[in-house]
């Protein structure tokens, strides 16, 4: 996981101990110098901010463009798909991982229907 945040990067800062980059392109270049590449671009941005990020994801050769809950941009998604990227919109990576591999119950989330509320009574 490589953080991209222009405001933090401008000050030479870090996020969770990792150097922050000003753009996806900058992050990809830094990783390429270490023999690594970005496979997935996971966007926590407003929907209207997605088109340039999708273009960067295509340009760096990412395999997947993932837009988090509440984030979707049909035009950018179609462009990325046309370039060969897998595009997921309006989904949370953590929730999907837990749904596929187990673990939703650890957070108090109903495993059949995702809800932020705990049940008032346990079903057993």
Role assignments for model-derived ranges:
Residues 41-42, 66:
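N-terminal Rossmann-like NAD(P) cofactor-binding module of classical short-chain dehydrogenase/reductase
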Residues 69-96, 103:
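Rossmann-fold NAD(P)-binding glycine/threonine-rich loop
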């Amino acid at each position: 996981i490589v953080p991209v945040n222009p405001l933090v990067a401008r000050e030479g800062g870090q996020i969770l101990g990792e150097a922050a980059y000003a753009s996806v392109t900058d992050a990809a270049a830094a990783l390429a110098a270490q023999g690594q590449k970005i496979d997935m671009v996971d966007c926590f941005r407003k929907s209207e901010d997605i088109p340039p990020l999708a273009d960067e994801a295509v340009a760096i050769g990412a395999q997947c463009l993932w837009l988090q809950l509440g984030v979707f941009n049909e035009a950018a998604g179609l462009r990325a798909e046309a370039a060969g990227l897998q595009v997921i919109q309006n989904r949370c990576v953590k929730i999907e991982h837990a749904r596929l591999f187990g673990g939703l119950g650890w957070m108090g989330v109903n495993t059949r229907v995702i809800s932020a509320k705990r049940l008032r009574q346990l079903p057993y």
